[in-house]
Amino acid sequence: MDFIASHHATARLQQRGIPSYVIDTLINYGKVNHDHHGAKILTFPKAVRKKLRNRLPKNKYIALESHFDCYAVLSEGVIVTVGHRTKRMKGH
């Protein structure tokens, strides 16, 4: 893990079955959306998915594909929480 996660985020990663490589990929390639309260939300919109398909080896892309609904919330450089999107986000 190349990121700093809060205790809450670490627990949510485990509870929600999200591997740490998904969060690494979100940090490196994910789209940043602001929540207008000081936090940033990282997601995998279609443009990012297309970029990943072209940049990652096929086996890594396939492993990541089932986690494209994941998001991470960052505040002051620390991951606050993670989860799976169940509703469409504006702009996606």
Predicted features, each with a name:
Residues M1-H92:
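Ribonuclease/tRNase effector modules and their secretory precursors
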